[in-house]
Amino acid sequence: MEAHYATVFEKNADAIPNEIALVCGENIRTWKEYDDRAARLATLLTSYGLGSDSKVGLYLHNSNEFLEAQYSVFKVAGVPINVNYRYKEEELIYLLDNSDSEAVFFQGCYAQQIESIKDKLDKVKVFIQVDDGTPQLECAENYEQIISSNEPMERFERSEDNIYMLYTGGTTGMPKGVMYTHGGHLGAMLNTAGAWGMIPIQEKIEIENVSKEVLRISEEESLTVSIPACPLMHGTGMWLGAMIPHLVGGAVVTLPKLGFDPDELLKEVERTKANNIVIVGDAFAKPLMDALDKAESDGNPYNLESVNTVISSG
């Protein structure tokens, strides 16, 4: 079994099909649904000629769709490209052109930005709009219609040498794509999961045994539930808040509201019984502590008994 994110996720979906993989508000997806929806999106990507090492922009907010779209790119052995939704037109053009993106998933609220730059993106073959109540762009495919009108792509063997890439934030110069192999990156994330107690620590965690261990945990204990409070478009949110828990069969809870609302996070921790919270420094930690203190002083403290770890990085 190759050390590739798509392959590990597929094995997890087979092992624990009815366990929860994604939660965003009232929208809940099981591992079976997560895998099926990503496979249908992958069919659309292949119909436009995308495949191994094809780059796909993810111009999205934290959501189930962000993670489904990324999984679909992994399935075709492609390379998801994180797009900062705060970028202006010239920055978007630079990033999507520099990354050689051939497809772009975008949040519906950014339809106007896509409309204004699409003719300058000669390499992009298809735009895919995630519906958020914004009128559908004529030049774009509709996300949910793709899922309803396509069959799941058949699985195939991939390589652990396939590229995974993360673009830097561009705080010192223009954004740059940092490249990893799936095997190297996945191995590091899996070892981190072991260090956090999400999966038993071994001298070397064998990829072949991950889904077996995930099944055992689901039957004998409970699978992890993680909330990335920070954007998935950055490494901290994606790697620590989503990729690691999904490697070990856990659920990822995303907060649909833009900006950080500590009370929204704490209420979601209570509702979903989250075990892990991922934040970025004092910009998150201080408001979080203030909200906890206020709730305590008001006589309505939050129930955080489910929380094992709060991880801050970045």
Residue ranges and their predicted role:
Residues 1-3, 135-162:
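Flexible, low-complexity linker/hinge segments
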Residues 18, 149-169, 173-174, 216-225:
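Conserved pre-ATP/AMP-binding loop-to-beta segment of ANL
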Residues 18-63, 70, 88-93:
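Conserved AMP-binding/adenylate-forming core of the ANL superfamily
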Residues 30-32, 163-208:
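Conserved AMP-binding A3 loop
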Residues 47-48, 75-145:
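Structural core segment of the AMP-binding/adenylate-forming
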Residues 61, 106-116, 132, 230, ...:
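Adenylate-forming
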Residues 61-81, 85-89, 97-103, 224-225, ...:
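A short helix-loop-beta submotif of the ANL/AMP-binding
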Residues 186-229, 233-278, 291, 295-296:
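Conserved AMP-binding/adenylation subdomain of ANL enzymes
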